Regions:
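Residue-level marker for buried hydrophobic side chains located in beta-strands
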Residues: 114-116, 147-149, 191, 237, ...
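Conserved beta-sheet core of the metallophosphoesterase superfamily
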Residues: 207, 232-237, 242-346, 350
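Active-site metal-binding loops of divalent metal-dependent hydrolases
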Residues: 118-121, 151-154, 194-197, 241-243, ...
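Metal-centered catalytic cores of metalloenzymes
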Residues: 52-73, 317, 333-355
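Core catalytic region of metal-dependent phosphoesterases/phosphodiesterases
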Residues: 108, 122-222
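Beta-strand-turn-beta hairpins that frame and shape the catalytic cleft
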Residues: 104-114, 223-237, 286-289
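Acidic, histidine-bearing metal-coordination/catalytic regions of metal-dependent phosphoesterases
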Residues: 1-113
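Short, basic, glycine/proline-bearing loop/turn elements
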Residues: 114-123, 165, 236, 240-242
């Protein structure tokens, strides 16, 4: 990629591209806006810069008694549109391929932990905001402990559900203030958008708040590979919810993903405000796979009460520890704690041990 194209190179690129700005910019290795700025400067200096050959002169239409010239099309020519779609696909492809497994380099030696926050719903009157305050403080006070969020940060009532703001004392504007306070409380290893969050559509405010915190935010799934200094890799597959359900086994979704999917070390999901856990062995690689569902900080839920859903919450969160000093196939490489203070104490114990 050249740093600066000459005027002659720009003219030749436009000629080769038959005047298509997007194609010429791509050939020159500059963005289209930069190319247009250069073209305007060249025209101001007297250069004759060709228009797109695809913008054919508009012929007048003769109706006998009168004629008129049709208006120019208000959209880009099809050839430029196709070039734009090609570039958009390449951007999409680059993002999707990179998202299949996101590498995260762990820079500190020894054991680490992840506190997976269940559905926060921080603006709901039934949310235990004091517990959120304690648990974010625990993350900040514990060396090697990272925070993670499985989604539904706020109620985010939209559409016909917007009427439900009348049933809570927190306004929509206040909800985003609390969400920002929550996200800025600690550093996040990953953040997932829940179904409530995604009701915002493409303009999801959480995406921008997370970006300000340099947090990894994914709207549906974050599959990450924690790579430790000793070469060990531990994979975490986090979703707001894994496909599949069973009245007999609330951990069915993440278990199904483990057995029929990517064979990662840890699967974590939220969504249904229930705690569940199952452990499996991958017979091929020998690793132990942990399938977890975390509940919610929305302790008192009128919807659940009205529908007769039972209380299946062990804790609003789960804390998992990873001990990289153990072999990859060791069954205790990953441990799950439902009481975060107990998990943090165990993590401190592991970190005191010689690496």
């Amino acid at each position: 990629m050249q740093l600066k194209a000459t005027d002659e190179q720009i003219l030749q690129a436009l000629k080769n591209a038959k005047g298509i700005r997007a194609a010429a910019a791509n050939a020159l290795g500059i963005n289209e806006r930069t190319l247009m700025a250069r073209i305007n400067k060249m025209r101001a200096r007297g250069y004759s810069v060709p228009d797109s050959t695809y913008r054919q002169p508009i012929a007048a239409i003769d109706h006998g008694d009168y004629e008129f010239t049709p208006l120019p099309d208000d959209d880009v020519p099809i050839e430029e549109l196709i070039e734009q779609r090609k570039r958009k696909f390449l951007h999409k492809q680059e993002h999707e391929e990179a998202s299949k497994l996101i590498p995260i380099k762990v820079k500190i030696p020894g054991a680490v932990g992840i506190l997976h926050f269940g559905d926060p719903h921080v603006d709901d009157d039934g949310c235990d905001i004091a517990a959120i305050e304690r648990h974010t403080a625990l993350v900040n006070a514990t060396e090697g402990l990272f925070a993670a969020n499985v989604g539904d940060t706020t109620n985010n009532w939209t559409g016909r559900l917007a009427r439900l703001y009348a049933d809570q004392t927190t306004s929509a504007a206040q909800a985003w203030k609390i969400a920002e306070w929550f996200i800025k409380r600690c550093k996040w290893l990953y953040m997932i958008g829940g179904n409530h969050d995604l009701w915002s559509g493409a303009g999801d405010p959480l995406r921008w708040i997370a970006k300000q915190q340099d947090a990894l935010y994914k709207s549906s799934e974050a599959r990450i590979a924690l790579r430790f200094p000793n070469g060990l890799e531990v994979r975490v597959n986090a979703r707001h919810d894994h496909a599949g359900s069973s009245i007999w086994n609330p951990a069915h979704g993440p278990m199904k993903a483990a057995i029929m999917g990517t064979r990662d070390h840890l699967y974590v999901a939220g969504h249904k405000h229930e705690s569940a856990y199952s452990v499996l062995k991958d017979p091929i690689s020998g690793i132990t796979m942990h399938a977890c569902k975390v509940a919610s900080y929305k302790i008192y839920d009128r919807y659940a009460k009205d529908r007769g859903f039972r209380d299946n919450s062990l804790s609003p969160c789960a804390l998992t520890t990873i001990n990289p000093s153990l072999p990859p196939e060791h069954p205790d490489l990953v441990k799950v704690f439902w009481e975060p203070t107990e998990g943090a104490e165990y993590l401190r114990f592991l970190r005191r041990k010689p690496v």
